């Protein structure tokens, strides 16, 4: 069964030779377990030999077995382009599961690093450890995707506690700031890219989302400043505001069907975004060569719900 890679068709019997050739051309290590793994599912090979840090990149799946979180969807999208990945999160088991699946399926290298940016932690040291491990393992950083965020949803401003507010600010705004700052010298060397994550909660002031919205709008401001400061260094920094079908929404629908109907609305597109194909692929493009001129922008991926003047 033939498949395409960089515009060429390869039959399975030629895949081993092709894999060896690509390894020599682009300097990546072949997967010992599968010499054709680097070709399987590869789109254009945009990130072969490059390194991407993805926060919140642990594995999550839907009931049908497909990717069930935005972070894992982004993992897959970059793996299909041949990127080596540094994935972070608090849950070691989910990180290790992502590593196992991605390496087996796509032949890329994945470095999982437990990282918890929260109140009471030495957050600079936590983030610096991620950067140091990335450089020690791969020698370069080409893109940083700041996806991870925790928050207390459904709590009004009047009822919000400082602990709840800090949860959102530390895990979102502070984490994004620290990953950007610590990665900057390496991104400058590679003329890399940053994609940060914001939300319609901030754009439209969603009820019960005060700390989450505040963190996300802070991230948008930080992104615009970075676009101006780092543009001359060849680094572009953009924002994605996604709406996607995730395991969390699937579980919410199963557990509270009436609440789901009342609070989760179908976008005009008629479906919720696919975390890999409709969110992850856009993130890949924002970090790729064709979108280097896009800088400081907010991209809403909400199937028509995120329309703004």
Give residue spans per PLM region.
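Catalytic Tyr-x(3-8)-Lys segment
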Residues: 116-118, 257-277
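Residue(s) in the substrate-gating loop at a strand-loop-helix junction
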Residues: 199
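Short, small/polar-rich loop/turn modules that mediate ligand/substrate recognition or access, typified
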Residues: 231, 236, 294-296
């Amino acid at each position: 069964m033939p498949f395409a890679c960089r515009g060429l068709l390869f039959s399975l019997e030629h895949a081993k030779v092709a894999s060896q050739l690509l390894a020599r051309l682009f300097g990546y290590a072949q997967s010992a377990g599968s010499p054709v793994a680097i070709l399987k599912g590869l789109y254009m090979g945009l990130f072969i030999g490059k390194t991407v840090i993805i926060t919140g990149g642990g594995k999550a799946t839907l009931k049908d077995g497909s990717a069930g979180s935005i972070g894992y969807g982004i993992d897959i999208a970059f793996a299909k382009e041949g990127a080596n990945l540094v994935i972070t999160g608090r849950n070691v088991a989910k990180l290790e599961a992502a590593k196992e699946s991605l390496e087996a399926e796509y032949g890329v290298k994945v470095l999982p690093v437990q990282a918890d940016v929260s109140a009471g932690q030495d957050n600079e040291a936590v983030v610096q450890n991620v950067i140091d491990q990335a450089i020690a393992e791969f020698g370069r950083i080409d893109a940083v995707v700041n996806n991870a965020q925790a928050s207390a949803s459904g709590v009004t401003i009047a009822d919000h506690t400082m602990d709840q507010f800090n949860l959102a600010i530390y895990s979102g705004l502070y984490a994004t700031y620290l990953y950007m700052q610590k990665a900057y010298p390496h991104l400058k060397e590679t003329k890399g890219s940053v994609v940060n994550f914001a939300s319609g909660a901030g754009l439209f002031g969603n009820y019960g989302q005060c700390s989450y919205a505040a963190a996300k709008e802070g991230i948008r401001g930080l992104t615009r400043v970075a676009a101006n400061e780092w543009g001359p260094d060849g680094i572009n920094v953009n924002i994605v505001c996604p709406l996607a079908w995730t395991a969390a929404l699937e579980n919410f629908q199963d557990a509270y069907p009436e609440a789901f109907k009342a609070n989760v609305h179908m976008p005009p597109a008629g479906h919720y975004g696919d975390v890999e194909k409709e969110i992850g692929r856009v993130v890949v493009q924002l970090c790729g060569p064709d979108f280097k001129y896009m800088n400081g922008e907010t991209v809403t991926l909400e199937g028509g719900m995120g329309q703004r003047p």
